[in-house]
A protein has these predicted regions:
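Acyl-donor-binding surface of acyltransferase catalytic domains
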Residues: 2, 100-172, 299-305
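A conserved beta-strand-loop-helix scaffold within acyl/acetyltransferase catalytic domains
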Residues: 23, 29-50, 55, 63-74, ...
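A structural microfeature
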Residues: 61, 148-151, 229-230
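A conserved beta-turn-beta hairpin within the catalytic core of GNAT-like acetyltransferases
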Residues: 68-80, 90, 109-112, 235-245, ...
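A short, internal acetyl-CoA/4′-phosphopantetheine-binding micro-motif in the GNAT/acyltransferase core
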Residues: 80-90, 119-122, 245-253, 282
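Conserved acetyl-CoA-binding loop-helix of GNAT-fold acetyltransferases
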Residues: 85, 91-104, 108, 247, ...
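Short hairpin/turn module used for nucleic-acid contact or packing/dimerization
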Residues: 253, 260-306
Length: 306
């Protein structure tokens, strides 16, 4: 026989034990405790979506959910941001019980679609890391349909080419200057960031909350003064992750993006990191060429209509 488990809403006082739990469960994420803190904060508006499973008074499982409001492009969506079950308590139905209860709560709140996918601007993963095989099996046996794949690339910061002096001098001669973001950039930079669409402006805003800001920009003189033409951020959601980044289409091919990328990775190396992850990677060849990045983690996204 297995010991019965009970489900209740998790509270702030549970956090120390929950950090220990996720560190044991998320074996492919060394910063699991930080991941929990990030997702816990994002669920603050609906704390009832933080559910804890206990056996004999000890935490053995956790789910953190969220509700995304309906938009012109998507229905109200329930998000399953995290499911973790202690290794010693797996295969007892705890994960399924937590998932079912979270689904019931977001459905009662109005969700007509469920997703297991990164929820920008503040997210921990693009989807389920396929190495968490039990999580993949749980999603697929619970009626979720696999969607797009997300890829991360890894960079060995100890050996990657991170020097930018010569390229910065070349760009400066062409009128493009690369520098770190500053607090004084906040208003004009975030106004410029809205042109990119999506949620990159939210991620960039978070980069500005750190001291020093975790981002770099490329600027040049325009008709109305200094204008931004490129940006890159790091450590926005997870300390070891890089992104987002973008360069004005008119300047692509000049090496602006490579300089911005290398500057951010140099920051991470200076902060004591040996490895960096490029999250939700798009142009694989660009990163492989620029910093010798290599393909690493694979994530599957899942959705289910209610």
């Amino acid at each position: 026989m297995t010991n019965p488990h009970s489900i209740r809403t998790a509270s702030e006082s549970d956090l120390p034990a929950l950090r220990t739990l996720v560190q044991a469960a998320l074996v492919h994420d060394q910063d699991a405790a930080d991941v929990l803190d990030l997702l816990w904060t994002q669920a603050a508006s609906r704390p009832q979506l933080r559910l804890l499973a206990e056996t004999d008074g000890q935490p053995v499982g956790l789910v953190v959910g969220a509700l995304g409001p309906a938009t012109a492009d998507a229905p109200a969506t329930g998000h399953i941001d995290l499911i973790a079950v202690h290794p010693q308590a797996q295969s007892r139905g705890i994960g399924r019980t937590l998932l079912t209860r979270a689904e019931e709560l977001v459905t009662a709140a109005g969700a007509t679609r469920l997703m297991m996918r990164g929820r920008p601007p503040y997210y921990a993963w693009p989807g389920i890391d396929i190495r968490y095989t039990r999580a993949v099996c749980l999603a697929e046996s619970s009626g979720y349909t696999r969607g797009r794949e997300g890829l991360n690339m890894g960079v060995d910061l100890r050996t990657a080419p991170l020097d930018t002096a010569a390229d910065e001098a070349r760009l400066a001669a062409a009128g493009v200057h690369v520098r770190r973001l500053t607090a004084q950039d906040e208003k004009p930079f975030l106004a410029w960031m809205t042109r990119w669409g999506g949620t990159w402006d939210g991620e960039a805003a978070r980069a500005l909350t750190y001291d020093p800001p975790r981002g770099h920009v490329a600027v040049r003189e325009g008709a109305d003064g200094v204008e931004y033409v490129g940006f890159a951020c790091h450590g926005v959601n997870r300390r070891s992750w890089f992104g987002p980044m973008g360069t004005d289409s008119a300047l692509r091919g000049m090496g602006v993006g490579t300089v911005l990328l290398r500057r951010c990775l140099a920051d991470q190396l200076a902060a004591g990191l040996d490895e960096a992850e490029i999250g939700w990677t798009g142009p694989v060849h660009f990163y492989a060429r620029g910093v010798e990045a290599r393909l690493g983690r694979v994530f599957w996204t899942y959705s289910k209509d209610i």
